[in-house]
Regions:
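Short glycine/proline/serine/threonine-rich loop/turn segments at secondary-structure transition edges
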Residues: 181-191, 286-299
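Aromatic sugar-binding surface patches on proteins
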Residues: 59, 158-180, 272-289
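Short flexible loop/turn segments that cap and initiate beta-strands
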Residues: 135-163, 248-251
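Juxtamembrane proline-rich low-complexity "stalk" or linker regions positioned immediately after a signal peptide
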Residues: 11-95
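Contiguous beta-strand segments within globular domains
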Residues: 103-142, 228-237, 247
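Short beta-strand elements
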Residues: 95-102, 198-228, 307-365
Length: 365
């Protein structure tokens, strides 16, 4: 996480100053809650998303036979903050999904369990729904809970703990928990833990969530939007009301007139307190290469403030619950020119003079 955040801010831009023009936003179809997975006896971080190709436009991942310069050119056809989006990139399409899976009990005996929840980020008064499912040889197994609690795990000096009550429903133990009852003032990591007796042995399971209390919300989307074509790219202007100044990162996905994913965009800048225009640039060549046309609409609009030196170090904004639809732009309204920048040209020049690895893996001259 730290490495990724360093990368976000090494090229931070200047803060926008103009408020986005007001338009009407529509409510999207609700996404189905994702299943989450359990943890073992030891406390571990949530599992990462399943592997996806970071650059689907380059085809199936594997050993490249390109020389470094060619490989670099292929990887940088599009800018790092606006890239193609495909239906298999669930980490972007379902950014609050968890990825726990059914796992074997420590003692074996054919027992497996899944301890999970319906989300990873919880904000304000939201309710976290968690489930514990236990099976023996694939069949549901009734168990007795010996412990169940939630506690603050970060910051480490704050150890609020509350007991959790689970109820059985269809062979699955279920709980609803409101982190707001902990009375926290800032973004915190919260761990949920259970211990159960399956008739042979006891087993512990654990997962973490990140919670942002109402008092700790750094900024909100106002619901005002605008769209334009600038320098051959689609720009969606998003109005943001900032309470806590600092470095922000805001992401959104773009879908075409057929509701197919087209592109992902990231805005990053230092924002002062007040209302600002976060300009999400969807690169023109991404749209042209997808042969996409409008009206486009955005989804999964979310953001966070980077709080350096804190743990957790991302203060979440409430995701925007609606959508915004652009005008009916034709495909040829956008440029098919490749991304270019001074940094890209410097890297091309550097790689062009480096003959050490010429030929790449599996090739020679």
């Amino acid at each position: 996480m730290i490495v990724a955040l360093v990368g976000w801010w090494t090229t931070r831009g200047t803060a926008p100053v103009a408020a986005a023009p007001s338009t009407t936003a529509t409510e999207p179809r609700a996404a189905a809650p994702a299943r989450v997975a359990p943890a073992g006896a030891a406390r571990v971080a949530p599992l990462p998303p399943p592997p996806v190709s970071p650059y689907p436009e380059r085809g199936v991942a594997g050993l490249s036979t390109d020389d470094p310069l060619t490989a670099y050119r292929k990887a940088n056809v599009y800018p790092p903050t606006s890239r193609p989006l495909s239906s298999d990139q669930l980490d972007l399409l379902r950014p609050n999904q968890r990825y726990e899976v059914m796992r074997a009990a420590d003692h074996g005996d054919g027992v497996s369990y899944l301890f999970t929840a319906d989300r990873y980020f919880v904000i304000g008064d939201e309710i976290l729904a968690s489930t514990l499912e236990v099976r023996r040889n694939g069949e549901p197994l009734a168990v007795r809970l010996t412990q169940a609690y939630a506690e603050v795990v970060s910051p480490a000096d704050d150890r609020h703990r509350v007991a959790l009550a689970f109820a059985s429903s269809g062979g699955v133990l279920m709980n609803t928990f409101a982190p707001a009852q902990l009375g926290l003032a800032r973004q915190s990591g919260i761990g949920l833990s259970v211990e159960f007796d399956d008739g042979v042995a006891t087993q512990r399971a654990h997962f973490d969530v990140q919670y942002t209390p109402l008092a700790g919300i750094p900024a909100r989307f106002t619901g005002a939007f605008g769209d334009s074509v600038e320098a051959g790219s689609l720009v969606v202007h998003v109005a943001v009301d900032v309470t806590s100044p600092g470095p922000y990162v805001i992401d959104a996905n773009l879908f075409d007139a057929a509701d197919q994913p087209v592109a992902w965009s990231r805005f990053k800048a230092d924002l002062a307190a007040g209302t600002h225009d976060a300009a999400l640039v969807f690169f023109g060549k991404v749209i042209v290469d997808a042969n996409a046309h409008g009206p486009f609409h955005i989804g999964q609009l979310r953001g966070a403030r980077f709080a350096a030196g804190r743990d957790p170090d991302l203060e979440q904004m409430p995701p925007f619950a609606g959508s915004f639809t652009t005008r009916a732009y034709a495909t040829d309204a956008f440029s098919d020119a490749e991304y270019d920048s001074a940094d890209k040209q410097r890297m091309i020049e550097l790689l062009g003079h480096d003959h050490t690895h010429r030929g790449g893996a599996g090739r020679g001259e």
